[in-house]
Amino acid sequence: MHAWPDPSVPAVAGTPVPLKLFDTADQRVKEVDTTPDANGEVGMYVCGITPYDSTHLGHAATYLTFDLAQRQLLANGHKVHYVQNITDVDDPLFERAERDGVDWRELGTSQINLFRSDMEILSVIPPCDYIGAMESVDEVIAMVQQLLDAGAAYELDQGDIYASIDATEQFGYESNLDRATMEEYFAERGGDPDREGKRDPLDALVWRGHREGEPAWDSPFGPGRPGWHVECSAIATNRLGSHFAIQGGGSDLAFPHHEFSAAHAEAALKVERMAGHYVHAGMIALDGVKMSKSLGNLVFVHKLSEAGHDPSAIRLAVFAGHYREDRDFSDAILAEAEERLTRWREQLAGEVSEAEATEVVDKLRAILADDLNTPEALSLLDGAAGDCNQIIATALDGLLGVRI
């Protein structure tokens, strides 16, 4: 599946600073392992959308977070192999299509196209591999077979196959949650703890046997379709190898999705840890209230763009808060971002020496390399009044994706 056009990302002046990010598994900020893989690249996998509804600013904020991370790596001279999936076969998609009386494939295609447009508007660097679940069914089948062969999965009635949480000793390391919280989140976030016959309530579905009215693919263990978590396990490791640098997504994916996608890959491939970093972006609220379709308070990127808001201002509004925090979005925050952008553009006429400009860029690099500290970065640039010459403007584009 094709992604969206690649924005021009300029080279950045100044001295590279190793990127450090907060790792959910280790519960600390640590340096990203940028040891290149066999292809000379640093691997990053970010979970994509389930295309059953319009993507909103909360989704966009997650992808802007990892766009920032990629920009710091690129500015440091690394080649990044970025992979993103699309869960284009899943229950929420089928349910929404049935509710609206449309074909689930058509619904998925329309929402994927809108997502692509949003990402292009925001100058998000596209993934090298943009992979739909339907494209990767053969890869999932192969991984499920590996789990069965390893004794890490078992079959129940109706052709359903589950992966055992005790297949790896390290299960639970990624999210650091206690058992009670795991069970609560598993039930709330797509799990089926009460499924009769399961060896453990937390065992996750990796293959759903065919039900009437649902799409299905042939496999050695019968017709059916992939489970949610194992899709990401297969897509990521088939492109980035059994171990890669960054697994990312929103904070709501830390458990169960990222815990299980790691566990499935580790059990199938017999590795201790799938990703060096598990990185999670906080949620976005509108005027202090979490964005929710039921509340009717979703903010859509394409609507902001149609209303004439500058994409660089939208980025600055999101970057006003730290990526790991649950944070607010409001008309006032967007207006402040637009004022900031206008002020910076006016400063472009300022004349400073190359040495002075490079000093500002070096400070900006160091701040962003420290767990993507955008609030401090914006403060630095606000304080550089009159110093925003072309060297700094280019750094803003390269490091923040903000065009002056």
Curated annotation (Swiss-Prot):
Sample GO molecular function, one term: zinc ion binding
Binding-site positions, Zn(2+): C47, C232, H257
Residues spanned by motif 'KMSKS' region: 290-294
CC terms in the record's Gene Ontology section: cytosol
NCBIfam families: mycothiol_MshC
Co-factor: note: Binds 1 zinc ion per subunit.
UniProt record similarity statement: Belongs to the class-I aminoacyl-tRNA synthetase family. MshC subfamily.
Matches recorded under Gene3D superfamilies: Anticodon-binding domain of a subclass of class I aminoacyl-tRNA synthetases, HUPs
Cofactors: Zn(2+)
Record key words, sorted: ATP-binding, Ligase, Metal-binding, Nucleotide-binding, Plasmid, Zinc
Motif 'ERGGDP' region per record, residues: 188-193
Motif ('HIGH' region): 49-59
Pfam families: tRNA-synt_1e
Lineage: Bacteria, Bacillati, Actinomycetota, Actinomycetes, Mycobacteriales
Assembly information from the UniProt record: Monomer.
PANTHER family listed in its UniProt record: CYSTEINE--TRNA LIGASE, CYTOPLASMIC, CYSTEINYL-TRNA SYNTHETASE
EC number: 6.3.1.13
Role description: Catalyzes the ATP-dependent condensation of GlcN-Ins and L-cysteine to form L-Cys-GlcN-Ins.
Residues that bind L-cysteinyl-5'-AMP: C47, G48, I49, T50, T62, N85, I86, T87, W228, G250, S251, D252, I284
The protein's name in its UniProt record: L-cysteine:1D-myo-inositol 2-amino-2-deoxy-alpha-D-glucopyranoside ligase
Keyword Nucleotide-binding: yes
CDD domains noted in UniProt: CysRS_core (cd00672)
UniProt catalytic activity: 1D-myo-inositol 2-amino-2-deoxy-alpha-D-glucopyranoside + L-cysteine + ATP = 1D-myo-inositol 2-(L-cysteinylamino)-2-deoxy-alpha-D-glucopyranoside + AMP + diphosphate + H(+)
